[in-house]
């Protein structure tokens, strides 16, 4: 996802699906496959920039950040509602303000549907788009089906249509490690 200086926010989504026969963890947690980052960098070479300040708000076990570091040398700030490793700061993304701190927000977010009392995926995407620096990018690993729905159209795509969408032709599984 990109946000230009005219405050016209648009985004790019890298689609993936989870049809793994392996067990899934609680908290809507899927361990990302590190190959997902390599595929993203092939399409989005601007990520190879050590000066980028990158946030991973749904870090899980840090698979995406570890893979990005191996390939580019870029480090990410890691947050998750459940801390699964020492360098992940345990926090609820919705309870912290990250406005204008990051050039890139990159994550495989939980796919939960929100409610009146609990924010969901659409709310999370809107928060990321509003918080990324002007000229920054939001990169999400999502199932293609998340492009659908009237709610997401009204909350996100109507005013912030996707800039680029990359879809895997071969599945990369996300699973319990």
Where are these regions (language model features)?
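Class I S-adenosyl-L-methionine-dependent methyltransferase catalytic core
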Residues: 1-177
